[in-house]
Amino acid sequence: MKYKWLIFILLLLPSFAFAQKSEGVLYGKITDNDGKVIELVNVAVQNTSFGVVSDARGNYNLTLPADTLINVVFSFVGYEEIKIEVRLQNEERRRHDVKMKVTSTLLPEMTVHDQSIKSSAITRIDARETVLLPSVGAGGVEDMVKTLAGVSSTNELSSQYNVRGGNFDENLIYVNGIEIYKPFLVGSGQQEGLSFVNSRLVSNIDFSAGGFSAEYGDKLSSVLDITYKKPTITASSLTLSLLGAEAHTEGMAFKGSMNYLIGARYKNTQYLLGAMDTKGDYKPNFADVQGLITYNISSRFEITALGYYSRNSYLMAPTTRETDFGNLQASYRLKVYFDGQELSKYTTGLGAISLNFSPNEDLNLKFIGSAYSAVESETYDIQGQYWIGVIDLNNEYNGEDHVVTNQGVGTYIEHARNYFYSRVYNLDHKGAYKYRDNVLKWGVRYQNQLFDDIINEWDMVDSAGYTQPHITDSILNPNNPMQTPLELKNVANGHNELYINNLDGYLQNSWQFENEKGGIWVLTAGLRANYWGYNGSVNVSPRAGIAFQPAKRPNMTFRLSGGVYVQPPFYRELRMFNGDLVSKDKASVQKSYQVVLGHEYQFKAWDRPFVLTSEIYYKYLTDIIPYEVDNIRIRYYADQKATGHAYGLDMKINGEFVKGIESWASMSIMKTTENIQYFIDAQGHILSQTDINNGADYVRDTIITGIPRPSDQRINFAIFFQDYIPYVPSFKVNLKLIFGTGLPFGPPESQRYQQKNRMSAYRRVDIGFSKQLISDATTFRNPRNPLNYIRNCWLSLEVFNLLGVNNVSSYMWVTDIYNIQYAVPNYLTNRQLNLKLIVEF
């Protein structure tokens, strides 16, 4: 079997936990200041996901390794967090009662590292919430991010998301301060494997939808900043489901001098893809393994090593497809019979070494060296013979609608031999210095990029017996016809090798002070600068943010942030449709001038804490590169430039809709458009910049304004909701709902200004029903029962796409006998079930 090594790891990891036989029990009762018991308090080992919750009587039982100094954290929404240090003897039972105090800060999600108030909105997500989240996508963390305000996604099979009118390439992702990159050739959600982020290894998740400070890098839209755990106890987990398996282990070694964190995952979506419209032989196999090891040389100096390896393979041999589309007035059925197959492979790796040195409590210095590489291939030869017919909805034949009119037949062939290799080296230095009420941060990075891209792809369409597009036959001399080469569609052919050296850095200061009336102010100002080696351009990005909390209304915070954000092209933005790279003089660094005004209101309803957050924003975009999206594949008009804007309103309310458990709902209203320069020739035809670069003549130029960008989703609404049976918290329900209005699209080979059609709205509900079979408080009569080594065990039944909505990922364009094009929807996954078993040791 191809993944024997992964199965071996999955079976081996639980044995690490079984070896920990020396244990003790910490137990007690948790009450408030008035002596009332508090249920559902999280009692956990610091910086881990291992813990228990108090029951309806406020009691808790936490099993801990013996002879180990451990920090235990007691936390609950609306109460101050309590930390204790404990060292238990073998088989010791120690009672520790806890009295919790009500805190003025209602929700712990709204915390910040350097100040109690943030100058720009940062949303913190509890990583433990991703464990029971129903998900078919590539990552639980990204699926949680999709429910936040300002974020939109219309493909559950992908971990990609849009933020405030931006595209997938405009989002920064960091893991332990290291920038994460994505595969280049992935073109559909079915091909996308596992995201880099392993939710089982995560400690903190911070997300900003815009207006972020200068310490974060050069992207236009968002930042997802993830910190992996630094374990203090030994623990493991194993998850099995119909979609794959994952396992992890964590702990300490060498008397606490070393911390280790290892995770492995395997995913197979054959079960999901087999129920889609296109039938055939699907063999998607995605696997990865990653580890984080920290060695503490002293209390002030540590070395951290992060390693990641991923191997993804997607084989599809389609046989048939049947899709109904249209409306009540005109309904059609498309049938396709296929030959051929597609095979895509993606192998990626990342290694990083980080040196963290703190000469004193106020100064921290970090040095990071990282290397990323990816070897990707996309090969396919697929022939489809299609048939279009009109469906008669009024009359049934054998209980089914039947086709009464043959509308067209045709054949198409898709061919690709694409190979891509990338390598990115980074050398970083970051520092932070605290003095008085100030925090000074700085950083500098050198980056070396290498890309080797071989592309060879084309399409051919033959409708009604002739090839499209075709050369007009010669009627002057039919006995000696013109010998002309076959013309193909969407031809891209080339071999590009590219070396780029980049340099960037930042300087930022934050300070907090009070005014005469006791109001608290936090001001952050910084400056970023980068040198882009492709064309030698230098860009400067000033950014600032200010927050104010009135003394008379400490439950309110007002924020204003913004600045200049630039994004040098990585590689995708440099490649034109024909496979060539744009010339250096025409390459542009995209820029965005942003301003964000926000308000945060903390209140209580039903005697429970809530937070209402709202932000309005405006972005002026300049030197942006127009693009189009097919499924999740982005293709840039690399030799064109545009200006544009995006503006909108984001709102989110989160709190205890159900006592003791946090849920939230978010809504976003947004509009984003762009203005593109076109040219008019002598016959009045509209030409693009690409046509002019290819030698076309024109009479005058014109600016077409108000073109909806491909990410122009006007309304987006999302809910993340948790519930449990009263007094029986072992029965839980997790629900995720996403609604988004349709995105713009247009026919193939059309210009951007022509792509104004709208997809149908994206509507999806995923729900999971979970039962905790074993908890830390569960005891068994036989002390030798192997189940005693299980700390938590959950069994979940997940229902994907509960409403059974046919959501659209993209369109297949076919032509009938009248030369009319039809946009046939490519539907995403339908309603399906998944069974998941989660075991924590």
State the predicted function of each range.
Residues 60-63, 132, 179-207:
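Short acidic/polar hinge/loop motifs at secondary-structure boundaries
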Residues 366-370, 589-656, 795:
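Membrane-embedded beta-barrel scaffold of Gram-negative outer-membrane proteins
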Residues 237, 243-266, 279-318, 342-371, ...:
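Transmembrane beta-barrel wall of Gram-negative outer-membrane proteins
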Residues 663, 738-748, 771-841:
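C-terminal beta-signal and adjacent terminal beta-strands/loops
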Residues 513-517, 618-620, 639-744, 838:
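Gram-negative outer-membrane beta-barrel transporters
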Residues 29-34, 41-46, 73-80, 89-134, ...:
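Short, acidic, small-residue-rich periplasmic hinge/interaction motif at the N-terminus
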Residues 319-321, 551-595, 616-641, 736-750, ...:
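Surface-exposed extracellular loop regions of Gram-negative outer-membrane beta-barrel proteins
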Residues 142-182:
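Extracytoplasmic beta-strand/coil segments of soluble accessory domains associated
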